[in-house]
């Protein structure tokens, strides 16, 4: 054909002509009803790679047609573009599967979901819904500009919306780096739990409180800073659990898990506040590893229970 030539684009800043490439336009094949009924495999993402994240994405999985009586296998049906896009799925946005602030491209979906949701925990300004009242109160501060958590470090004066943000910020003053690379003989320490070791990017970070007391800021020359650090570490010691004393547990972890709401295991939208409270009280050594493995088992079990519930709802 005479029209199938190389496309030439003129640059605004230069008179030179740049040869780009041959652009082939292929008509989009319309999706038929038979294609929409065929089960398809879910995308290759973190959901498929990491089993401990099954609980986060279990409500995104649907069962293909005809699999209710047979062997149930998790599939995604793409009967419509709205269902193919996970961000437009109401279930994906129902309880918030990510901690902290949402991505900029998901805010509009959250607002639209709030307009059609029956949840009573709703922001009266932007109609966004939340899984719990505490999350709503923290969210409203983004509209009012309220920052009730003030850093009392001398000459700092920074304020934060959530208490967890204040605790993370104060590590910059104290020099704390409680998160250590789990790789043996690495020794890389970090201030935040969401960092990754450059040498071992796939290794997880574990919480490890320093045993030597205050860090590099201990010998501060400023008297006010020294007093603040002393008060800070005294408060930390009072909150830290006494070694050798554990809270009595009348129930096993599995029994306690079965009686809790399965949605409690999903990450909430409350930032890092609750997560840091648990990490602060966590012991060190092998107990941390055992607790992490137990949490992974809980999330795997939650993912399996969610799939079973979806299968029951589909068959009903």
UniProtKB/Swiss-Prot annotation:
Residues 61-97, 234-294 are annotated as: Disordered. Gene3D superfamilies: Classic Zinc Finger. Residues 255-278 have a biased composition (Acidic residues). GO terms for cellular component: nucleus. Residues 70-82 have a biased composition (Low complexity). GO terms for molecular function: DNA-binding transcription factor activity; RNA polymerase II cis-regulatory region sequence-specific DNA binding; zinc ion binding. Its main location: nucleus. It is found in: Nucleus. The keyword NADP does not apply. It holds the Pfam family zf-C2H2_6. A zinc finger (C2H2-type) spans 121-143, 149-173. One of its GO terms (biological process) is regulation of transcription by RNA polymerase II. SUPFAM superfamilies: beta-beta-alpha zinc fingers. Residues 289-313 form a coiled coil. Keywords: Activator, Coiled coil, DNA-binding, Metal-binding, Nucleus, Repeat, Transcription, Transcription regulation, Zinc, Zinc-finger. Transcriptional activator. Belongs to the krueppel C2H2-type zinc-finger protein family. PANTHER family: TRANSCRIPTIONAL REPRESSOR PROTEIN YY, ZINC FINGER PROTEIN 367. This is Zinc finger protein 367. It comes from Danio rerio (Zebrafish).
